[in-house]
Amino acid sequence: MPPAKISIRDLNFYYGDFKALKNINIDIPEKKVTAFIGPSGCGKSTLLRTFNRMYDLYPSMHAEGQIILDGSNILAKDMDVNLLRARVGMVFQKPTPFPMSIYDNVAFGVRLYEKLSKAEMDNRVEWALKKAALWLEVKDKLRASGLSLSGGQQQRLCIARGVATKPEVLLLDEPTSALDPISTGAIEELITDLKNDYTIAIVTHNMQQAARVSDYTAYMYLGDMVEMGETDQIFTNPAQKATEDYITGRYG
């Protein structure tokens, strides 16, 4: 396995008294795509949200253990969470463009963390939209509302917004589940391109998608990490019978 970008050690996560993640120990390799699969409620989206501490917004939720990003424990009390979220971008299940222009959607996060001149911001917005394979479709209407775009375009706009702050890690929580097959294919191609520059973790219910886009796959069940390995191995020769049962449709 390549060097780890994120190392998770003895991670437990709680919703109040409910233990949603149980003693997770895995490494997320750098500049690869790692997919998390498993039935609804298995903890895969919860795990993804620990990587940028989204749960901090909810007082009843807390994590224990360590999540090491480039040598620093992001669960430490003195971690600058705003800076963390600049380093670890996130794209959600449904496209979430802000009710503002396409340009301002992309510039929004950058303005929080950097002081750029107008020319520098123009260049950053163009760069991010090109990264998200959206520039050619919107370059002549940057002042139009982000809400005016199609669903697939909106999701690519959200990816552009996510990469505009130049994060090191990109979290994708079922990024194509609300999209049509053509838009899904475009996002999957984009994911393959983006891994050249980013460490990507994706949650998906679509096992065919996991097989297509990921280098590594982790199977979770009821808050446990059942198995993680190279995607080809997980799908053709899993070590655990529970993984095989899920992948072959015998689960449940």
From Swiss-Prot:
Gene3D superfamilies: P-loop containing nucleotide triphosphate hydrolases (3.40.50.300). It holds the Pfam family ABC_tran. ATP binds at G38, P39, S40, G41, C42, G43, K44, S45. GO terms for cellular component: plasma membrane. GO terms for molecular function: ATP binding; ATP hydrolysis activity; ATPase-coupled phosphate ion transmembrane transporter activity. It is found in: Cell inner membrane. One of its GO terms (biological process) is phosphate ion transmembrane transport. Disulfide bonds: none annotated. It catalyses: phosphate(out) + ATP + H2O = ADP + 2 phosphate(in) + H(+). It is an enzyme of class 7 (translocase). Its EC number is 7.3.2.1. InterPro entries: AAA+_ATPase, ABC_transporter-like_ATP-bd, ABC_transporter-like_CS, P-loop_NTPase, PstB-like. Residues 6-247 form the ABC transporter domain. PROSITE patterns: ABC_TRANSPORTER_1, ABC_TRANSPORTER_2, PSTB. It is a peripheral membrane protein. SMART domains: AAA (SM00382). Keywords: ATP-binding, Cell inner membrane, Cell membrane, Membrane, Nucleotide-binding, Phosphate transport, Translocase, Transport. Belongs to the ABC transporter superfamily. Phosphate importer (TC 3.A.1.7) family. Part of the ABC transporter complex PstSACB involved in phosphate import. Responsible for energy coupling to the transport system. NCBIfam families: 3a0107s01c2 (TIGR00972). The complex is composed of two ATP-binding proteins (PstB), two transmembrane proteins (PstC and PstA) and a solute-binding protein (PstS). This is Phosphate import ATP-binding protein PstB. It comes from Psychrobacter arcticus (strain DSM 17307 / VKM B-2377 / 273-4). The gene is pstB.
